[in-house]
């Protein structure tokens, strides 16, 4: 379970402070993959980043005894002056036991298919190469929850299929916290839904289709 208590997150803007969330309270159940549904700017990705520990709230708590990934495929955190291998080794030291380091590095090297570039500085990589390394690194470690923000596969058609197969394998063993513009992907991978509107959560739904229906309804109301 992930328990969110009195969570507040805001940003300074030229016109004053903008609140993404204010005193948010919600529980995410164990063993359930959750679809986060809402318009752009509703706070879905911000909440995922805070759950994953790469952004901090102004106040409040996120309480869990589960392991949670960083956003799958995140490539922005690599150190450009280090090689792909060195970046992977650095992360592996944080998330794996000493005796597992070689295995994790070999997994990413084989999966990302970067050849000689795996031992070259990240700053020489194309965006696609960074994405392949980021996806492989995300999948190298087992988590109770994977954070999936609009990314399920990268690269050419063959590599995308390879990513999709591994993605499905991880889904058999773990839960996803997922944001996607593809409602079909949300229905395929998620069990329940949380629907966002502006800076608050409308509700928690025991099946994804109910959440999608609610989302479509308030969209229609806003248009009218």
From Swiss-Prot:
Domain of life: Bacteria
Keyword Mitochondrion: no
Gene Ontology terms: cellular component: plasma membrane
Subcellular locations according to the entry: Cell inner membrane
Positions annotated to bind ATP: 38-45
MF (Gene Ontology): ABC-type transporter activity; ATP binding; ATP hydrolysis activity
Residue span, ABC transporter domain: 2-223
Record bears the keyword ATP-binding: yes
Bilayer topology: Peripheral membrane protein
SMART domains reported in the protein's UniProt record: AAA (SM00382)
Keyword annotations: ATP-binding, Cell inner membrane, Cell membrane, Membrane, Nucleotide-binding, Transport
Gene3D superfamilies linked: P-loop containing nucleotide triphosphate hydrolases (3.40.50.300)
Protein family membership: Belongs to the ABC transporter superfamily.
Entry function: Putative ATP-binding protein, and an energy coupling component for the transport of polysialic acid across the cytoplasmic membrane.
Protein name, UniProt field: Polysialic acid transport ATP-binding protein KpsT
Gene: kpsT
């Amino acid at each position: 379970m992930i328990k969110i208590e009195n969570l507040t997150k805001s940003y300074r803007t030229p016109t004053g402070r903008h609140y993404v969330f204010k005193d948010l309270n919600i529980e995410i159940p164990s063993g359930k993959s959750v679809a986060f549904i809402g318009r752009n700017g509703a706070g879905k990705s911000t909440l995922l980043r805070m759950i994953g520990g790469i952004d901090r709230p102004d106040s409040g708590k996120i309480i869990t005894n589960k392991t949670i990934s960083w956003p799958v495929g995140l490539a922005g955190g690599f150190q450009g002056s280090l090689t792909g291998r060195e970046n992977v080794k650095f992360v592996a030291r944080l998330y794996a036991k000493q005796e597992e380091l070689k295995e994790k590095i070999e997994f990413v090297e084989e999966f990302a298919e970067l050849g000689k570039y795996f031992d070259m500085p990240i700053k020489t990589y194309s965006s696609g190469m960074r994405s392949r390394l980021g996806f492989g690194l995300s999948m190298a470690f087992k988590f109770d929850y994977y954070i999936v923000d609009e990314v399920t596969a990268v690269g050419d058609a063959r590599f995308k299929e390879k990513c999709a197969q591994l993605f499905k394998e991880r889904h058999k063993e773990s839960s996803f916290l997922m944001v996607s513009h593809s409602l079909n992907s949300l229905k395929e991978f998620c069990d329940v839904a949380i629907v966002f509107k502006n800076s608050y959560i409308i509700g928690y739904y025991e099946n994804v289709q109910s959440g999608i229906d609610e989302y479509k309804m308030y969209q229609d109301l806003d248009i009218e």
